[in-house]
Structures are given as structure tokens and as C-alpha cells.
Amino acid sequence: MKPAMETAAEENTEQSQERKGCFECCIKCLGGVPYASLVATILCFSGVALFCGCGHVALAGTVAILEQHFSTNASDHALLSEVIQLMQYVIYGIASFFFLYGIILLAEGFYTTSAVKELHGEFKTTACGRCISGMFVFLTYVLGVAWLGVFGFSAVPVFMFYNIWSTCEVIKSPQTNGTTGVEQICVDIRQYGIIPWNAFPGKICGSALENICNTNEFYMSYHLFIVACAGAGATVIALLIYMMATTYNYAVLKFKSREDCCTKF
């Protein structure tokens, strides 16, 4: 029979080793988390959600403003309405694609991070796995370049609405308010090319323009376009993070797959 103190000491040692084993297991699991891909996924989901949601509503508000104030004849802006409707459907596709693509990239990040850090014993990776990682690197680069174009394109309506808003601020200013020159301050939406030059009225001046700026459609569309542009910028940043993470992981996988590899990055 062992003394009670020795038995208690052995139990405490076993419990300590068990706690230490759980702690080491948790640290090992946390070491396999691809934090860069995780941050990029959250940022990508947020950016795409802002761009798609706000952009969809802002486009609908833009059509309402054009129909009510700048182009009363439906045939003059029929093509623009079809293009905007098509863009709204494209937005649905973008949201669905990036939701799936973000999850796939996050899963690929878990795989490559675990392989790079050799969390599962001896390092093993297949040629197919490296090929898939290389494909994601190429696809992410292509999407990054494409989203730079989307980001630039999303700034165009912000510029247009800002010009209209700044013109309204000039009309509201004390220097011009109440003078006869107010009615000569105009905004011609036809100069942006979104409606033809024969569209009527196409140009709004003075107090009528000020009334447009005071409508809820203009206020909401303007600010939603700003948020959509910011969402596109956030998506570009997320794709840049994806690029760095996937490129690094692919380079390490490619390097460590060589038989003469004897060092680590």
C-alpha cells in the first residue's frame, strides 16, 4: 500500500500533465489557423455585402430620379434601365460567387497552413494539392485586377452625385440665395452620357434642382453609392491579403516539396 501523500502527489502529477497536454493541443490547433485568410475572408464578405446590397438599392434610386426629373420620356432611358436591371442581376451573381469563393479560400488556407507548419507529423503534400494552390493564386490575382476595375467604376456615380450635390450647395449658399442668377445654375445629366442628348428635359436648374437634392431618393442613393464604393475598396484589400497569403503558402509548399530541401522559410 502506498502512502496517501504519494498517491495524492501522483494524481496531481497526472492532472498537471493532462492539463499541459490539453494546453499544448490547443496551442497546436491555434497554430494551424490561417489568420491572414481569416481576416481576408471577413473583410471580403463585408466588402461584397456592402457593395452588392447598397449598390442594388442605389441603382434603383437612380432610375427613379432619372424617370421623375431628368427623362420623362421612357423611350429615352429605356437602354439605361435595361443595363441597370442587368447590373442588378449581376450583383446577385457576384454575391453568391464570392460567398462560395471566400469559403473555399479559407479552407485552402487551413490546408496549406497546416502543411507548411507540419502540424500533422511528417510533411506530406501531393502534386495535385500544389497545383490547386497555384490555381487559387492565379485566380485570386485575376479577381484582384478585376475588382480594381470595379472599384474605379463604382466611383463614377459617386462623382456624378457629388457634382449635383455641390451644385445644390452653391444654390443654397447666402451669396446666391434670392438672386436672379440662381435659375441660371443648372445640372445637365446628358453630359455624362447616361441618357441621350435628345432626352427631355435633361437639364434641371435653380429651385427645381434644389428640390431634387432635398428628396429622399437623392439623399439615399448618394450615400449608398459612397458605401458601395467603400465596400468595393474593402474587397480589393481583402483580395490583396488573399494574394499574399496564397502566394506565400504556395511558394513554401513548392520549396518544401523538393527533395534537396533542408531549410525552412
Curated annotation (Swiss-Prot):
PROSITE patterns: MYELIN_PLP_1 (PS00575), MYELIN_PLP_2 (PS01004). The keyword Chaperone does not apply. One of its GO terms (biological process) is nervous system development. The chain crosses the membrane at residues 31-51, 90-110, 136-156, 224-244. Coiled coil: none annotated. The modification Phosphoserine is found at residue 257. Keywords: Cell membrane, Developmental protein, Differentiation, Glycoprotein, Membrane, Neurogenesis, Osteogenesis, Phosphoprotein, Protein transport, Transmembrane, Transmembrane helix, Transport. Pfam families: Myelin_PLP (PF01275). GO terms for cellular component: membrane raft; myelin sheath; plasma membrane. Neurons and glia; cerebellar Bergmann glia, in glia within white matter tracts of the cerebellum and cerebrum, and in embryonic dorsal root ganglia. GO terms for molecular function: structural constituent of myelin sheath. It is a multi-pass membrane protein. It is found in: Cell membrane. May be involved in neural development. Involved in regulation of osteoblast function and bone formation. Involved in matrix vesicle release by osteoblasts; this function seems to involve maintenance of the actin cytoskeleton. May be involved in cellular trafficking of SERT and thereby in regulation of serotonin uptake. Belongs to the myelin proteolipid protein family. Interacts with SERT. This is Neuronal membrane glycoprotein M6-b. It comes from Homo sapiens.
